[in-house]
Regions:
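Short glycine-enriched nucleophile-adjacent loop
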Residues: 221-233
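Active-site rim elements
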Residues: 94-98, 180-185, 246-251, 307-308, ...
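Gly/Ala-rich beta-loop-alpha elbow adjacent to hydrolase catalytic centers
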Residues: 216, 220
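Substrate-access "cap/lid" subdomains that shape
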Residues: 97, 193, 200, 204, ...
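Non-catalytic accessory segments of hydrolases
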Residues: 2-174, 178-185, 209, 443-450, ...
Length: 525
């Protein structure tokens, strides 16, 4: 299917323009009064969905481009919440959400609730991935109707946030940049603002504002692990689930400044004032030419300069965290790029990330790669799986435990029949969101009992802070005791398709402690 066909299909499924309802003609049972208006959703069977609710008072357009998100203001109006908003500006990449129509007017969220009678349901807030460059809530994978049908005792929210050069652009070093001291981390501040809206309004949807779990995958998972490090954020959530993403997905201020300078050169701009005159599509074109990876910044202001150390010092000790990774993370990218694309990608990344290593560390890396068996791509794929995803996941479990907090850790192993994909990045998403029909990555529907069990664990964690399942809650009738990660035994839950079981990390050998774990200090991504 061509991109324009996908775009129109998404519009047909979820798109449109929400309008004010001024004639009083709406179904009161589908309306929820919030601070910034009354929003009217649509019902599918026993699930009511509210799409495209703004969580800011003003959208980040015009002079508000690259400014922190603005609080909502009281509003007595009534509005449709029938359609997804446009996606944030970003590079399409692998993300369906960025194939959809894009706009700077993008800070909206969706709410999925069941009719099942209950007040104060646990709330799960989804933060999408896409390398901080792409993605969006309109992705059919993140349609949570199936999830809420199966788990009617939770409310699910999906949020959008600014991406790429709109969400993570360092500007304060420019001659007129003194009023842009937050621009390098706006995407994260958007997420905090969305969580504030949820805290203040979710009770009207049957949710418990004091029992919120944030969860995400890839950049969304990284966001989930970074948000606890932002001052004042803990009042909005109690726990987090991070699927294949951690606090390593960040950069230094020096790297941020270098990225901005490259952009300015391509666009012929010298000041923020110049940049404000540039059309969003032009910025997008420039970013795609530069191949510059825009990510959150360890600026010492919004985020600490050492995000791992912050966990070790107890920054998240009052939160429960559930983190994990997939067995063959980078194989997804091999499969997606094809041989020529992968070879180019990995050559550039190795030059960028490994060329400057000290000789003794290069020797360790080379030794690791020599021991990897498999196809031509597997040594590189395994190395980058370790440095980008697996080692950082284990390290954050370590640091959370050192800091006195609770960490639950998983290792996801089901494979696609595709010999390249195997158990690649994002392959668990169709399991989490109950979309067995979506097999583009999985190549097949995974075992139904396994899938239900994994979802039950996620929901149980959101409810209680512990993902263990008693026999009566477990789909196969067998109790699943998920141990806390600790510094001695380093126990994890192996999410094997036909044998979910706890194990010591040393038994599974998830990370190479000697030859790849040290790479986490370089914040590779």
């Amino acid at each position: 299917m061509e991109l324009h066909e996908i775009r129109e299909k998404l519009k047909e499924m979820y798109g449109g323009e929400n309008k004010p309802i001024t004639d009083g003609n709406f179904d009161q049972s589908l309306a929820v009064k919030c601070i910034n208006g009354t929003f009217v959703g649509r019902k599918t069977e026993n699930i009511t969905v509210f799409r495209g609710i703004p969580y800011v008072g003003k959208q980040p357009v015009g002079e508000l481009r690259w400014k922190a998100p603005v609080d909502v203001v009281p509003n007595d109006g009534v509005y449709e919440a029938y359609y997804n908003a446009k996606s944030a500006f970003g590079n399409p990449g692998f993300e369906v959400g960025s194939i959809y129509y894009q706009d700077e007017d993008c800070l909206y969220l969706n709410v999925f609730q069941s009719d099942e009678a209950s007040t104060k349901k646990p709330v799960m807030v989804w933060i999408h991935g896409g390398a901080f460059e792409s993605g969006g809530t309109i992705d059919p994978m993140f349609d949570c109707i199936n999830f809420v049908k199966e788990n009617p005792d939770v409310v699910v929210v999906t949020i959008a946030y600014r991406l790429a050069f709109m969400g993570f652009l360092h500007l304060s070093h420019l001659s007129d940049g003194k009023d842009y001291t937050d621009s390098q981390n706006l995407g994260l501040l958007d997420q905090v603002k969305a969580l504030k809206w949820v805290h203040e309004n979710i009770a009207g949807f049957g949710g418990d504002p004091d029992n919120v779990t944030i969860f995400g995958e890839s950049a969304g998972a990284a966001s989930c692990t970074l948000l606890p490090l932002i001052k004042g954020s803990h009042q909005y959530f109690k726990r987090l689930i991070a699927e294949s993403g951690s606090v390593n997905q960040t950069r230094s201020p020096e790297e941020g400044i270098a990225c901005t300078n490259k952009l300015m050169e391509v666009l012929g701009c010298k000041t923020v004032a110049d940049l404000l005159k540039v059309d969003g599509n032009k910025l997008l074109e420039a970013s795609s030419v530069l191949f510059v990876h825009q990510v959150p910044e360890r600026d010492g202001k919004i985020l600490p300069t050492d995000t791992f150390e912050a966990y070790a010092n107890g920054a998240a000790k009052d939160l429960e965290i559930l983190v994990g990774c997939n067995k063959d993370e980078m194989n997804f990218f091999v499969s997606s790029f094809g041989k020529e694309g992968w070879d180019s990608f990995i050559s550039n990344r190795k030059q960028e990330k490994f060329a400057q290593l000290p000789a003794d560390e290069k020797t360790l890396v080379e030794s690791y790669m020599k021991d990897v068996k498999g196809d031509y791509f597997q040594p590189d794929s395994s190395l980058f799986s370790q440095s980008w995803f697996i080692a950082p996941t284990i390290r954050i479990s370590e640091e959370q435990s050192k800091g006195g907090g609770k960490a639950y850790t998983y290792y996801f192993t089901p494979e696609s029949p595709d010999p390249i994909m195997k158990c690649g990045h994002a392959i668990e998403l169709s399991v989490v969101f109950n979309h067995p029909e979506m097999t583009a990555d999985t190549g097949r529907a995974f075992d139904e009992t396994f899938c239900k069990t994994m979802r039950k664990m996620w929901v149980q964690f959101a409810k209680t802070g512990n993902p263990s399942l008693s026999a009566d809650l477990s789909p196969d009738g067998k109790a699943k005791e998920w141990p806390l990660y600790d510094l001695k035994d380093k126990r994890v839950m192996v999410l094997d398709e036909f044998d979910i079981h706890p194990a010591k990390e040393s038994e599974v050998k998830i990370v190479d402690w000697e030859r790849t774990y040290f790479l986490t200090k370089y914040y590779m991504l």
